[in-house]
A protein has these predicted regions:
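DPxDG-like acidic metal-binding loop motif
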Residues: 19, 76-101
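C-terminal nucleotide
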Residues: 1-3, 8, 16, 24-57, ...
Length: 235
């Protein structure tokens, strides 16, 4: 996530960039392996919506998420569960109808997001949409998180180069969201002010990107870092 964290949960815009680490899902060499519950939920929704004729049997797919854990089994914050859910649905669709995952990618993205959120019990699902669509994505939920996402696909300025660094500490998104929601409950004005600062930084980010101004984007990200730190300290 580049901009709009937490504010996206309350109608703000978020920007997210896919990375070149991949979840791999293929046929399991033997039945009975573990199937993530997010994949099971996505398959069930896909059947209801006509993306699949039938849901694969649990244990019929092999999941390899090692590229998203640095090979050390640690949670790096790269969206491994989101990528695994998307890859699982894409695998199931391709197994039934080759080419269908690409042909119906927008539907795949929405279905995977809803299946993932159903199991996770919250969050925006922006990471799922980004994993499915790739590249740089903007997302807003104008009608709440249960409604349709307004999604835009964009290009980074040619002069901009991104690198991803790990902090060295694993965190659970659900726990972070719970702390921010607790702030909203006991200090709603502080919560609103902190999210407004994130929204303002996100608007700066979007303007800079549309102007193809790499330096202004860096300034916006720096401002967003301060806004996120202030939210964390308040929560």
């Amino acid at each position: 996530m580049l901009a709009g964290e937490y504010a996206v949960l309350h109608g703000g815009e978020a920007w997210c960039l896919a990375v070149d680490r991949y979840a791999v899902v293929d046929d399991a060499p033997a039945a009975g392996g573990f199937t993530p519950p997010e994949a099971i939920a996505a398959w069930r929704l896909a059947v209801a919506r006509g993306l699949l004729r039938e849901a694969p049997a649990e244990g019929s797919a092999r999941f390899d998420l090692t590229a998203l854990s640095g090979g050390v089994g640690r949670k790096l914050g790269l969206g491994s569960s989101a990528a695994g859910c998307v890859a699982a649905l894409g695998w199931a669709m391709e197994r039934e109808r080759p080419g269908s995952a690409d042909a119906r990618r927008d539907e795949l993205a929405r279905c995977a997001r809803e299946g993932h959120r159903e199991v996770q019990g919250g969050g925006s699902g922006v990471d799922v949409l980004t994993s499915a669509l790739g590249g740089l994505v903007s997302v807003r939920f104008g009608d709440g998180l249960g409604g349709e996402a307004v999604v835009g696909r964009h290009r980074l300025p040619g002069a901009l180069r991104w690198r991803v660094f790990w902090s060295g500490t694993s965190v659970r998104t659900s726990e972070m969201i719970a702390k921010v929601e607790a702030l909203r409950a006991h200090s709603p004005q502080v919560h609103a002010a902190r999210l407004a600062a994130i929204d303002a930084g996100t608007a700066d980010f979007a303007r800079a990107l549309r102007a193809d101004d790499a330096a202004a984007m860096v300034s916006a990200v720096r401002r967003l870092g301060g806004a996120m730190a202030a939210l964390g300290e308040a929560a």
